[in-house]
Amino acid sequence: LAIPLAAMRYDDLPIKSMIGILCFASISAVALPMGLAYLLHLSEPTIMAFATRAVTTPIALNIATLLHAPLMMVTLIVILSGVIGAAFSPWILKHIHDERASGLALGLAAHAIGTAQAWQRGPVTGRYAAFGMAVNGVFTANWLPLFILSLP
């Protein structure tokens, strides 16, 4: 992960757009699964497990420990979301012709599995997927526990 990110050119990154995309992706990737779990009247630990869906498994397990979510369920949710995201990405992204955009989408939505698939599409797609996954992991790992633990 570090080598492709070190080789990436950062001078042409649209920073404002990327920050907006990152914030929207992170918040929606947490809020939508949590909201669905809440609407289905699932238990609080299960809802907390769904909150970790936004990040890759190692980061999700650390967040889950802070949120007291069941670790096995977190692992299942995160890995399944990555597999499903990678499986449906060719269909969902078929009209996206910008390698940077499709890579970022794969990294944000399908984590490590999506990043591996992005590398099969090409080095630019893979770099942006790795960048999206890494930055989203750091961002979500910081705001999510603070937000959840500050709720009454």
What does each of the following model-derived ranges do?
Residues 8-33, 75-84, 132-138:
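Entry/N-cap segments of selected transmembrane alpha helices
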Residues 35-46, 65-73, 148-152:
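Helix-coil boundary and interhelical linker segments in multi-pass alpha-helical membrane proteins
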Residues 1-5, 26-38, 57-61, 82-94, ...:
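Transmembrane alpha-helical segments of multi-pass membrane transport proteins and ion-pumping complexes
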Residues 17-19, 45-46, 100-101, 149-150:
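A short, structure-level motif marking secondary-structure boundaries and short turns
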Residues 3-5, 46-71, 79-84, 98-135:
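Alpha-helical membrane segments and immediately flanking helix-loop junctions
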Residues 10-11, 96-98:
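Membrane-helix interface "capping/anchor" motifs
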